[in-house]
């Protein structure tokens, strides 16, 4: 993996300079990741060090190439009985962990209560990250009250698992065949609202979730005249920057938004109350969105 990551990094530099041979080498590297390295990881006993080395191979690649490798790995898993069996075992183990999650009201008690399950989930995700995070999203989507416990339980998941989580989120958001409005034709469907809330909570909590990929997905849906996924962007801004939607701003508040940070903070607090998170966390979240 160390040699592979060095080769990928070198070819990326040459590909940016227009080297056709380097671009061809990157295509072969993507194929090797999808057909060999990712499947081999899912068949080995869970080992965070192995997952970290695999992430070192993937990290230099653009997110589009990484997600393409994840999609190819998922297709290969569906076509292979051995890989499918390994994925099913990981899903069964993940569901056992998720069924035991609970969220005490006190934040410190919640952290202590979820820490053992988070460690178990992190170990499972080191072996089969794609299957594990898909099970987590499938659990949180129909049960919005499970979003916070599931996000807290991912505390010990590595960067590879979080990148797989970004891929799974975008894949489920883009899955066709599900109406994005309720039967009344006015309100957003529950599944879309839950996924948007999950995306916002994950991006606020973990830097390993790729905000650029989510924002690019929203931009692509807008180009296709699909406005409903802007709910994802709204959740990202609300949770990461602490700026919830404010439809009823007065003229004075609108004018105050053109001022400095302190004036903007005061103007928004008048309409929304106290903003989520501390000032440092909001500044870090806003910087990631910029």
What are these regions (language model features)?
Residues 1-290:
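Eukaryotic alpha-helical solenoid repeat scaffolds
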């Amino acid at each position: 993996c160390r040699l592979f990551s060095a080769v990928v990094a070198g070819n990326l530099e040459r590909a940016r300079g227009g080297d056709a041979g380097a671009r061809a080498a990157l295509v072969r590297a993507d194929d090797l990741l999808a057909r060999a390295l990712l499947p081999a990881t899912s068949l080995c006993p869970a080992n965070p060090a192995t997952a970290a080395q695999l992430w070192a191979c993937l990290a230099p690649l653009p997110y589009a190439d990484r997600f393409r490798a994840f999609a190819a790995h998922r297709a290969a898993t569906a076509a292979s009985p051995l890989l499918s069996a390994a994925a099913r075992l990981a899903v069964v183990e993940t569901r056992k962990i998720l069924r035991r999650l609970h969220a005490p009201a006190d934040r410190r008690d919640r952290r202590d209560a979820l820490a053992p399950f988070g460690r178990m989930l992190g170990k499972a995700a080191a072996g089969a990250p794609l299957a594990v995070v898909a099970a987590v999203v499938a659990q949180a989507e129909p049960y919005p009250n499970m979003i916070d416990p599931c996000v807290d339980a991912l505390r010990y998941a590595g960067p590879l698992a979080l990148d797989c989580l970004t891929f799974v989120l975008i894949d489920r958001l883009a899955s066709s065949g599900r109406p994005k409005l309720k039967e009344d034709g006015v309100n957003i469907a529950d599944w879309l609202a839950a996924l948007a809330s999950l995306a916002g909570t994950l991006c606020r909590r973990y830097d390993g979730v790729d905000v650029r990929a989510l924002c690019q997905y929203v931009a692509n849906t807008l180009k296709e005249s699909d406005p409903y996924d802007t709910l994802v962007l709204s959740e990202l801004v609300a949770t990461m920057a602490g700026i919830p939607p404010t439809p009823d701003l007065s003229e004075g508040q609108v004018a105050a938004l053109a001022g400095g940070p302190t004036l903007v903070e005061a103007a928004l607090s008048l309409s929304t109350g106290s903003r989520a998170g501390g000032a440092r966390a909001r500044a870090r979240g806003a910087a990631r969105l910029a």
